[in-house]
Design a protein with these regions (language model features):
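Short Gly/Pro-enriched turn/cap motifs at secondary-structure boundaries
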Residues: 29-32
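Compact, glycine-rich, soluble single-domain proteins
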Residues: 53-67
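C-terminal binding/interaction regions
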Residues: 2-9, 13-24, 76-151
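Histidine- and/or cysteine-centered catalytic micro-motif in compact active-site loops
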Residues: 42-44, 53-54
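Short beta-strand scaffold segments in enzyme catalytic cores
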Residues: 34-43
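Short, well-ordered amphipathic alpha-helical segments that serve as non-catalytic structural scaffolds
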Residues: 20-23, 65-73
Length: 151
């Protein structure tokens, strides 16, 4: 299957993401805040993945919709997220929280596009100077080299 890039996105892609996010939102478990959220993303291989928020009486363990989306991404074969949409119960765009921006970043195509309340934005715009696997490797790789030099 050919790879989809953000430059290939059409209005039809965004409409499909919005509809899937709305459908996912209907499955949200939000008995405490009653703030239901659905998220959907297009994967570089053409798949669509989605998730909904799942609240918990211990608010700190509540799962955002993006958590479910990334779990589905991994469960269905992984890949890179090309486009992302998140909606509330009224169908309005929701911005991912900081934790979810980092979570999405881990699985994002380099030029992933997100539908934000203020318009379309790249992953670098919503999470500038993001922490990536390259940051980990830079430190771990340097520590490995130092350990080897000391032996």
């Amino acid at each position: 299957m050919s790879s989809i890039a953000p430059t290939d996105l059409t209005d039809a892609h965004w409409q499909a993401l919005h509809e899937l996010a709305m459908e996912a939102m209907t499955h949200a478990y939000a008995p405490y805040s009653r703030f239901k959220v659905g998220a959907a993303a297009l994967v570089d291989d053409g798949r669509l993945v989605s998730g909904c928020n799942v609240e918990n009486a211990g608010y700190g363990v509540t799962l955002c919709a993006e958590c479910g989306l990334v779990s589905e991404l991994i469960r269905t074969g992984g890949g890179r997220l090309v486009a992302f949409a998140c909606v509330d119960a009224l169908g309005r765009a929701c911005a991912p929280c900081g934790r979810c921006r980092q979570l999405l970043s881990e699985h994002a195509a380099d030029d992933m596009v997100l539908a934000m309340p203020s318009g379309m934005m790249s992953i670098d715009e919503v999470l500038p100077d993001r922490f990536t696997a390259a940051d980990v490797e830079r430190v771990v790789g340097e520590e490995s080299r130092r350990a080897a030099d000391e032996q």
